[in-house]
């Protein structure tokens, strides 16, 4: 049997109170893509109104999502997948657009998504995404 390591922390004052969590694009984009998985209405609060979020919403609308902003609250629903083809004009604008592929496969049984575009911020391969989808 191995030796287990334990870290004991003797604190002073217990933590209590509230913490405001600010919206982040990198959290919002996968949640938006996941909205394709259900026909039910979804409400997201404190969604950042950034270019990548707007491009993702354009892509989702092309695929069948209806959405409406109410301040920083976003209401969306995808009653049906109207297209399984993500147009390159949108996919090419943003790296995160690639993540709609899994949701399309799960909900519609197929998905056609070009290799993602976006910024040239270093080397960011998508091979792990492809391997995961091939394993389905």
What are the functions of these language-model segments?
Residues 1-136:
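Structural preference for solvent-exposed beta-strand-turn elements
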């Amino acid at each position: 049997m191995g030796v287990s390591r334990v870290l004991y922390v003797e604190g002073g004052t217990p933590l209590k109170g509230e913490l405001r969590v600010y919206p982040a694009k990198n959290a919002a984009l996968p949640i938006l893509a996941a909205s394709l998985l259900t026909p039910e209405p979804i409400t997201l609060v404190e969604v950042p109104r950034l270019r990548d979020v707007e491009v993702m919403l354009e892509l989702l609308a092309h695929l069948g999502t209806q959405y409406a902003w109410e301040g920083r609250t976003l209401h969306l629903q995808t009653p049906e997948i109207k297209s399984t083809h993500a147009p390159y004009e949108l996919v090419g604008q943003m790296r995160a657009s690639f993540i709609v592929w899994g949701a399309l496969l799960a909900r519609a049984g197929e998905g056609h998504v070009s290799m993602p575009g976006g910024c040239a911020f270093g080397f960011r391969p998508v091979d792990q995404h492809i391997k995961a989808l091939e394993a389905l």
